[in-house]
UniProtKB/Swiss-Prot annotation:
One of its GO terms (molecular function) is zinc ion binding. A zinc finger (RING-type) spans 17-56. Keywords: Metal-binding, Nucleus, Repressor, Transcription, Transcription regulation, Zinc, Zinc-finger. Transmembrane segments: none annotated. GO terms for cellular component: PcG protein complex. Its main location: nucleus. It comes from the Eukaryota. Residues 120-149 are annotated as: Disordered. It comes from Xenopus tropicalis. Coiled coil: none annotated. It is found in: Nucleus. This is Polycomb group RING finger protein 3. The gene is pcgf3. The keyword Membrane does not apply.
Length: 242
């Protein structure tokens, strides 16, 4: 089989963010046109605009953040193509928490450890996947299975109903992983209220509809940065946006 080498420079245009001109971090794609950007760059841009930065198509007149989604496949591709990028990003996150005097969340610790193991394996020439290399001891596997993200950074939430068409939750105060998404909350509320579909719900923060792929950590940082816990979210029946 014939193979040829391709320079990273030749594909840079496909794996960089048009807004910051850096390699994609937390890749996020516009569902309407499929153009991809760094999540932080795109969200900041959409706070004052409602069009795609690349093709200028209108994403949505009033709620463009509802029509973007995390692109895990693209992010995996970028990390595999750019040597050291994922390791550098994990190091930045670790330094960020240390600078604030905060403990690094368990999920980030796990990702940092995975990256280190991957880098060390390549340095040692272990390019082939070994069945025994990535197997975890039974005790560690069992402990991980029963952790349920309790070692993650946690977020305290108050879920309030702001519609007469839905009833309030009996227990509106919850605490969960910062990596949980708005979609997880929708499913939780739908289950508690016996709704036929979680898609019938909108969840809002500061009267702004949140995208289903937004993590709670992202919501806290961008919508609740200077406010005290708990994070106050409201839910209501889904409204069709024109």
């Amino acid at each position: 089989m014939l193979t040829r080498k391709i320079k990273l420079w030749d594909i840079n245009a496909h794996i960089t963010c048009r807004l910051c001109n850096g390699y994609l971090i937390d890749a996020t794609t516009v569902t309407e046109c499929l153009h991809t950007f760094c999540r932080s760059c795109l969200v900041k841009y959409l706070e004052e605009n409602n069009t795609c930065p690349t093709c200028r198509i209108v994403i949505h007149q009033s709620h463009p953040l509802q029509y973007i989604g995390h692109d895990r496949t693209m992010q995996d591709i970028v990390y595999k193509l750019v040597p050291g990028l994922q390791e550098a990003e994990m190091r930045k996150q670790r330094e960020f928490y240390h600078k604030l005097g905060m403990e690094v969340p368990g999920d980030i610790k796990a990702e940092i450890l995975t990256v280190k193991q991957h880098v060390e394996a390549h340095r040692n020439g272990e390019t082939k996947t070994d069945e025994h290399t990535h197997k975890e001891p039974p005790e560690e596997k069992q402990e991980e299975d029963h952790d349920y993200h309790r070692s993650d950074e946690q977020v305290s939430i108050c879920l309030e109903c702001n519609s007469s068409k839905l009833r309030g939750l009996k227990r509106k105060w919850i605490r969960c992983s910062a990596q949980a998404t708005v979609l997880h909350l929708k499913k939780f509320i739908a289950k508690k209220l016996n709704l036929s579909s979680f898609n019938e719900l909108d969840i809002l923060c500061n009267e702004e509809i949140l995208g289903k792929d937004h993590t709670l950590k992202f919501v806290v940082v961008t919508r609740w940065r200077f406010k005290k816990a708990p994070l106050l979210l409201h839910y209501r029946p889904k409204m069709d946006l024109l």
